Amino acid sequence: MKTTAEIRQSFLDFFHSKGHQVVESSSLVPENDPTLLFTNAGMNQFKDVFLGMDKRPYSRATTAQRCVRAGGKHNDLENVGYTARHHTFFEMLGNFSFGDYFKQDAINFAWEYLTSPQWLGLPKEKLWVTVYETDDEAYNIWNKEVGVPAERIIRIGDNKSAPYASDNFWAMGDTGPCGPCTEIFYDHGDHIWGGPPGSPEEDGDRYIEIWNVVFMQFNRLADGTMEKLPRPSVDTGMGLERISAVLQHVNSNYEIDIFKTLIAKTAEIVGATDLTNKSLRVIADHIRSCAYLIADGVIPSNEGRGYVLRRIIRRAVRHGHLLGAKESFFYKLVPTLIDVMAEAGKDVKAKQTNVEKLLRLEEEQFARTLERGLSLLDEALSQVKDGILSGEVAFKLYDTYGFPLDLTADVCRERNITIDEQAFDREMEAQRTRAQAASQFGVDYNSIIRVDGETKFEGYTEVESQAKITALFYDGKSVESIEAGQSAVVILENTPFYAESGGQIGDSGYLSAQGVTFNVKDTQKYGQVFGHIGELTQGSLKVGQSVNAIVDAKRRHNTSLNHSATHLLHAALRQILGLHVVQKGSLVSDKALRFDFAQPEAITKEQLTQIETLVNQKIRANFPVQTDIMDIDSAKAKGAMALFGEKYGDKVRVLTMGDFSIELCGGIHAKRTGDIGLFKIITENAVAAGIRRIEAITGQNAIDWLHNQQRILTQSADLLKSDVNTLVEKIQQLQDKTKKVEKELQGLKEKAAMQAGSDFVKSAVKINGVSVITQQLDGIETKSLRVMVDDLKNQLGSGVIAFASILDEKVNLVVGVTNDLTAKIKAGELVNLMAQQVGGKGGGRPDMAMAGGSQPENVAQAIKVAQDWLNKNL
């Protein structure tokens, strides 16, 4: 029996033997594709190739692509663990043809791999196929060439209520590449309920789809017209877990070797004995998606991809607690996961320490969140009047505190309270709508600027070149010429202008000819060509014309210094903070650099100083900035890091700075690190959960910044009649003096307030024989208010005191109740009622409670509410 790892390798070996380039799985975070939440299909990394915007040095490819479906249209999360085949994480085996072979070879390759004794050796009589209703070509290949009997070939028409809306017709979007597909099904046998595809019983588990072969042969226009593509392509996908279940003779994916091992390990860790428990399935599935998402740079957070990751982790942890887990357990599955994934586990193994750390921290945080959620639930239940907890509160517990609905229901049942689940479902649906990420490529394929060929980039060595115009675009449309005053995009055959990429801004400058000036404001890539974006201020330009392309050399130079400094900063961060630091984004301009990176903890001032010092040491070392072109495997073997947001071909540009930094980079750089001159960090802060940002400047900009800081220091010293060297000491003296004066003033205020205590006793109001004092005393701290309340309680003997004070734009509330009245009047209940009026909350003992608030303008209302409540309850 083949293991899952052996099946994965045999698939790649088979297609390699058929002339396919074996391409590594891409990240679960799609590169430069904001339309996708996660990589969810094998073709995602080849999207631009299919669109004609990218070229590869091969026309046939095969991959074992890791995928996640837990958001947007492809959302399997709620079914995971409860069905035989739903997963958040799965591997998609695929073979691809980019204008090379088409239907005949694609179908024959699939049949050979599935049925040949040399490969999988599946019984031919167990295989059924579907084709699009009008795809006679595919039908005839299956029937006449391959030999599949007509009774096992099913034509599927437009079964989704629209033209070309069919299980057997695939489209990239509303417009663009599309075409029919053929699907291969495996018949598990009549001992399992279900019917063949297209039948009323097709949702059963007898006939399982194992392979989908898509034939991209049309381009759909905006008006619905289908035009044939000049170079049709093939995109296929086969779920590794599904084919493993078939070959390992089991009916559920959770019974294959990978899941059996993960389930057994989970049971061992949490102390479970029933290996069929669905919670074990949930955890075994979720450790795969969570570990790979973190390895690919996703960090748990409250938005976007991080929010989906957090939901998956918490769902797994919750199921662990259902199984009886008493301590953190989820992260302990990572070593087992790495082992069972074999070669496909290397990316997690490389980040194992960070993966385990983040999983453990998130699980521990969830435990604390559960406690806070219980407190909120207790408070909400105390206010329920009609025996029903609102669905909005239940959803807040779920969404904000990660509180499972069934746990909320258990607590409610103990108090004979039910939940308005319909309202909860409405809130959940509204949240799904807000968070849903479109799974289609939300662009009009036909509106993209597309130009055949490519622009030769000469900017590594030149800032000025003669070049021929190959295309012009005005108002998004291709034109033959433009006139003065028009803004346009100019495509050149060759150019010294750098197009924005890898965080580095595009070059600016101008294009000139006799009597012609085109100001270039930005440079962007459109597929393989460079677009010079700007305005023609003089003359006219036409396709085929030669121009002199001149880059703004000063702006380019300053940008190059900042880009090289970014590499030094990245290396310094990894050396000072740890190898878990990876780039999450950057912006390199001529004025400054911005660098976002993964870092779960705050950076201390000492660490920040160490980082800045280390970068400046490497600048003074004056390392040569060396570039080498090599294949991707050699670059990785050399230890080169890939930069976030960049795409790399088989040949890559490796940038080395001494023995300190080595990265893959296509950007413009300084010749030596010494050219940077000076590196100065301006700000450092968190921009998202687990993501921090450093902004810095270099060269003359850094020197100018230091001069300005010196000027500010000198002016400050002059104002304080000090000098720069003793400025801190002088400020400290002033602060000490100010604190002393403020303390004396506060003491005088408190003394005056205490002296007024006897007046408060005299002015106490009697409510049903109980003495009540409600007063606003501004400028008094909470501590002093407490002392006053205690003193007045003693003077009254029996009574209620409620004080409000405004201090530094904030509200302090203190309520005291003598012991003889606490059965009827509770200080905590009254102070919370007052706090609600001033935007705050609080609590305490029945005889003494405090609260704070942020709305001083509502203090009078808080006093009135207290008086009304006491009138009602005494």
Swiss-Prot record:
Q: Where in the cell is it found?
A: Cytoplasm
The enzyme's E.C. designation: 6.1.1.7
Family affiliation: Belongs to the class-II aminoacyl-tRNA synthetase family.
Give GO BP annotations, semicolon-separated: alanyl-tRNA aminoacylation; negative regulation of DNA-templated transcription
PANTHER family recorded: ALANINE--TRNA LIGASE, CYTOPLASMIC (PTHR11777:SF9), ALANYL-TRNA SYNTHETASE (PTHR11777)
Which InterPro entries has this protein been placed in?
aa-tRNA-synth_II/BPL/LPL, Ala-tRNA-lgiase_IIc, Ala-tRNA-ligase_IIc_anticod-bd, Ala-tRNA-synth_IIc_core, Ala-tRNA-synth_IIc_N, Ala-tRNA_ligase, Ala_tRNA_ligase_euk/bac, DHHA1_dom
- Cofactor stoichiometry and binding remark: Binds 1 zinc ion per subunit.
From the broadest rank down, the organism's phylogenetic lineage runs: Bacteria, Pseudomonadati, Pseudomonadota, Gammaproteobacteria, Pasteurellales
UniProt: Zn(2+) binding residues: H563, H567, C665, H669
Q: Which domain of life is it from?
A: Bacteria
Tell me what reaction this enzyme catalyses: tRNA(Ala) + L-alanine + ATP = L-alanyl-tRNA(Ala) + AMP + diphosphate
Annotated GO MF terms: alanine-tRNA ligase activity; aminoacyl-tRNA deacylase activity; ATP binding; tRNA binding; zinc ion binding
- Domain remark in the UniProt entry: Consists of three domains; the N-terminal catalytic domain, the editing domain and the C-terminal C-Ala domain. The editing domain removes incorrectly charged amino acids, while the C-Ala domain, along with tRNA(Ala), serves as a bridge to cooperatively bring together the editing and aminoacylation centers thus stimulating deacylation of misacylated tRNAs.
Recorded GO CC terms: cytosol
The UniProt function text for this chain reads: Catalyzes the attachment of alanine to tRNA(Ala) in a two-step reaction: alanine is first activated by ATP to form Ala-AMP and then transferred to the acceptor end of tRNA(Ala). Also edits incorrectly charged Ser-tRNA(Ala) and Gly-tRNA(Ala) via its editing domain.
Ordered alphabetically, the record's keywords are: Aminoacyl-tRNA synthetase, ATP-binding, Cytoplasm, Ligase, Metal-binding, Nucleotide-binding, Protein biosynthesis, RNA-binding, tRNA-binding, Zinc
Requisite cofactors: Zn(2+)
- The EC class name is ligase
The entry's protein name is Alanine--tRNA ligase
